[in-house]
Amino acid sequence: MKEFLRKKNIIFSAKRYGIDALGAMAQGLFASLLIGTIISTLGEQLGIGILVTVGGYAKGATGAAMAVSIGVALQCPPLVLFSLAAVGMAANELGGAGGPLAVLVVTIFAAEFGKLVSKETKIDIIVTPFVTICVGVLLSLGCAPAIGAAASTVGTAIMWATELQPFFMGILVSVIVGIALTLPISSAAICAALSLTGLAGGAAVAGCCAQMVGFAVMSFKENKWGGLFAQGIGTSMLQMGNIVRNPRIWLPPTLASAITGPIATCIFHLKMNGAAVASGMGTCGLVGQIGVYTGWVNDIAAGTKAAITEMDWAGLVLICFILPAVLSWAIAIPMRKCGWIKENDLKLDL
């Protein structure tokens, strides 16, 4: 049996599933949902309709892109790899807020089952896609909704935190939503489902920015400009493989979010009154910042805000960019010196 599995390149390994597959999935997410979001946002802000259309198609391929990228990491044969596109679409759609996590779990099973039967029959072109797709879609129907429901429980903690005083609410919402953004679940979907706007939305934006900008800046030594942009306006989920290897690298941006959250709520009174989904997007395509600005404009039109002040702009820039960068970088320095963060712990394969 061991020899058969070895021949099929099926290796039951925490590294292969928890690091290689997870890291590849994050790249698939970037190459579809996140780049699509950036393209769509550019189109909306510049009034170029074709870019909005292009971005929409890119975002629509999210599940397929993640699944295929996982298949590449698992070294799947061609027919298995191509079949995973359908599996990813099913898992992502049925997984809801836990879509990326559902894609990861389901795709691993579907890929390994597909590899088991690959080249074992004379009608391989039928058997291999049939097994891969059936296993993946049936698993998606059975477990993806449960994974989505589990991911949505994060919303319960967020809603509890929103009922606290602004200081503690700022800390908890910022930290929880920021962590959700980096995990293979959808912070944007959670925020949209909770209609998270207002002061709590501002705290959520702060937490997401702390993760994205924090990782981008503290890993600049390893990843240079490519990593700065990929994480800073893309996603901090790219670091999940490295986080599994060394969870300590998550401390600087998470601590930064615990600081910027209450500053956003108590000092700058930063509110996100745009579309709720923007609360969970952070600096991805600058959607979070555009959401805050849109909220200001809407509030002025509704008569609940007199004007956009210099304090508003200062708060937005400090909370979303400057403070996360400075705090994460400063916290990471002693951690590097004491060996908690080692050389290349933050390195990305870009």
Summary of predicted features, one role per range:
Residues 1-350:
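Pore-lining transmembrane helices
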